[in-house]
Amino acid sequence: MALTAALKAQIAAWYKALQEQIPDFIPRAPQRQMIADVAKTLAGEEGRHLAIEAPTGVGKTLSYLIPGIAIAREEQKTLVVSTANVALQDQIYSKDLPLLKKIIPDLKFTAAFGRGRYVCPRNLTALASTEPTQQDLLAFLDDELTPNNQEEQKRCAKLKGDLDTYKWDGLRDHTDIAIDDDLWRRLSTDKASCLNRNCYYYRECPFFVARREIQEAEVVVANHALVMAAMESEAVLPDPKNLLLVLDEGHHLPDVARDALEMSAEITAPWYRLQLDLFTKLVATCMEQFRPKTIPPLAIPERLNAHCEELYELIASLNNILNLYMPAGQEAEHRFAMGELPDEVLEICQRLAKLTEMLRGLAELFLNDLSEKTGSHDIVRLHRLILQMNRALGMFEAQSKLWRLASLAQSSGAPVTKWATREEREGQLHLWFHCVGIRVSDQLERLLWRSIPHIIVTSATLRSLNSFSRLQEMSGLKEKAGDRFVALDSPFNHCEQGKIVIPRMRVEPSIDNEEQHIAEMAAFFREQVESKKHLGMLVLFASGRAMQRFLDYVTDLRLMLLVQGDQPRYRLVELHRKRVANGERSVLVGLQSFAEGLDLKGDLLSQVHIHKIAFPPIDSPVVITEGEWLKSLNRYPFEVQSLPSASFNLIQQVGRLIRSHGCWGEVVIYDKRLLTKNYGKRLLDALPVFPIEQPEVPEGIVKKKEKTKSPRRRRR
């Protein structure tokens, strides 16, 4: 479709009207360029997909929404905007789209959150009830749902009242009532525990109400994990050919895709035996009480028992083999080099893939049959079986995917990382098996790039070391396929608005020197606090260990420090804003996650402290396997993995400072390697152009370090 004169006029009219809605709106050339590039791509005038880096201040959200909505209307398609996290998803849904609705009054939009963000009305009713019959019913359905105390019951009753009177839409983030994680776990549900259309509350269920709204919406705000799942199952979202897709925070996509495709399962032999026994009994109950018209051959008791016995023997053999690779009787981990399994293990995995897939098919057949039963049956008993069969289906589905992935030598042209872990829980040792591909470009090509005609991938940071090459390698986007890569200029004058400060540290921030380095950092930080030049400050660390050691050095300043983990992030930011507004000094302290999505302008943040260059951890199974693979290709892992990742992290950290034309301040980086190592210049060259200062550092007095037992990493 060409960009017609009428379409261009519509986009221009909305953009002009928007300027009247935003106080102090400043027209910016990069924003106009982004609107034009997005429009050309979505209309099919230029290229297949567009990766566009839009630095802070460009106004990227409105720059893709305006042309996206106009073209979606013209082509009668749905515009899907996907983000990496719930916070940005909610911001677009609650702030940006309502703003656009002022200039597009008939705009219809909705949000598609994951099932776990919504309350389950069935569970809420049980927890809000004082009637024991409700709780007895849930117990019969194998759901232990009782309030822990009267206060919790009253809280749930208030939530139910708000839901029933439409004061609350059922989203966890949209209520002011405090809901701790333990209570929310019981209030929400997952796919395996949902009765779907068989549930009494189906028509009023917030999750399904939201899903039905998608069919009527012009704009759907989703997240990357949900989009990946929807493309895999062809559910939730409209047909890919009828979509326009924008992937905001697109730099997260490869990691989200990899996480979505990672498979893990417990394979402890006694536990596995119990699951198989429960399933055979479940099938027997279905055959006895709700016999299907057509009997699946595998449901015949003798055949099912023999099938499960073979499956158990394979699992038991695998337990014995894997345990040989790990020290006996304790928590441990074993990774298979280059993802290459011994022949014996590979043969077991291949056979397990076939056997678990057959059980998955049997569970699905019974579940479909049970779901079609009429009201002439005992509905409570039927629902109990549906829930149990649904959970069995979820287990065998995950197992089938795990063993299929374990059977692959490569995925997306790279090895599949495979490892086993032994973990202690409540005094018992449990064995787990894990698989994940180190590259997901083929899967992204199949699910997204080839399926959806035109996609916009955008973020304030898409490049590392001034290059799109890392994004191209990890995502599979490529110029040869017609994909375009654009980096917009920043609208800010960084030279005038701020500076980078690299203190003259005596030591590098290596593990051996960590204590002295943090002591020096704390001394310089204390000097900055005492100067009283800055009201709002942010301190970013590469590890929780280093953050804790720093806090040990500044205990007398603890009252002004708002530390990640003390409270939910949004509450820390709220408190920070209030303090600065009252003229008080306030310091946010956190890890890399605080370097994303934190938008504090002016005095709210005028000094950022960065502990050190944040190279990625090198001890995870995925990173180690990727390193082995790169070396086998005569590629240097530091250049391919570590340095681009560090550059990316540093760009994001430094990007916290200048958020508007009125922002000012300093970025203090406590890492002399930026000036002494060859790669330091490359890292600095990828940052906005700030003047650099190198002040002296007061001597830090090293504290005696208490011996602490470092926690063992359980997962990658």
UniProtKB/Swiss-Prot annotation:
It is an enzyme of class 5 (isomerase). The keyword Hydrolase applies. GO terms for molecular function: 4 iron, 4 sulfur cluster binding; 5'-3' DNA helicase activity; ATP binding; ATP hydrolysis activity; DNA binding; DNA/RNA helicase activity; metal ion binding. Keywords: 4Fe-4S, ATP-binding, DNA-binding, Helicase, Hydrolase, Iron, Iron-sulfur, Isomerase, Metal-binding, Nucleotide-binding. Its cofactor is [4Fe-4S] cluster. Disulfide bonds: none annotated. PROSITE patterns: HELICASE_ATP_BIND_2, HELICASE_CTER. A motif (DEAH box) lies at residues 131-134, 248-251. InterPro entries: ATP-dep_Helicase_C, DEAD/DEAH_box_helicase_dom, DinG/Rad3-like, DinG_proteobact, Helic_SF1/SF2_ATP-bd_DinG/Rad3, Helicase-like_DEXD_c2, Helicase_ATP-bd, P-loop_NTPase. Gene3D superfamilies: P-loop containing nucleotide triphosphate hydrolases. Residues 17-294 form the Helicase ATP-binding domain. Its EC number is 5.6.2.3. ATP binds at A54, P55, T56, G57, V58, G59, K60, T61. Residues 517-698 form the Helicase C-terminal domain. Binds 1 [4Fe-4S] cluster. [4Fe-4S] cluster binds at C120, C194, C199, C205. It catalyses: Couples ATP hydrolysis with the unwinding of duplex DNA at the replication fork by translocating in the 5'-3' direction. This creates two antiparallel DNA single strands (ssDNA). The leading ssDNA polymer is the template for DNA polymerase III holoenzyme which synthesizes a continuous strand; ATP + H2O = ADP + phosphate + H(+). DNA-dependent ATPase and 5'-3' DNA helicase. Unwinds D-loops, R-loops, forked DNA and G-quadruplex DNA. Belongs to the helicase family. DinG subfamily. Type 1 sub-subfamily. This is ATP-dependent DNA helicase DinG.
